C-alpha cells in the first residue's frame, strides 16, 4: 500500500494474513515527498531502505490476525502484505461535517482551510513576482517564518 496520511484517526483491525506496517510522526511530513494538496507520497516503496529519506523517524511492526492498531490522525503510514490479508479500518469522526473542500470517502482529503490557505499563498506570491530575486526571497522567507510561528503559538 502506498504511503499516505488520513485526516481522521482510525483503528486497523487485522483479521487474516500478515503484513508489515510502517508509520511516521507528523513532524516527518516535509521529508516524505508529499506534493502540495496530496495525501499520498510520491515515494514508490516506503519499505525499500534505499528510498528512505534522511532524518525521518519511522516505526514498524508486523501485524498478525487479531492485532488492532490505532493510527493517529495525520500520521503518514503504509502497509506491505507478506501474504493475502484481510483488515478493517474504523475511522473516528473527529471533524465536523464540511471540514474538507469536497466529499471525503476515505478520511484522507485535506482540510478546506488548508486548500483555501494554498490559494491565498498563491495570490501573495504573485505580489512578489516583480521584485528582484534577493528581495523576493528575503520577504517571502520572513512571511514563511511568521506563518510557522503562528502555527506554534496556537
Specify the residue positions occupied by each region the protein language model found:
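Active-site region of the double-stranded beta-helix
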Residues: 1-67, 78-154
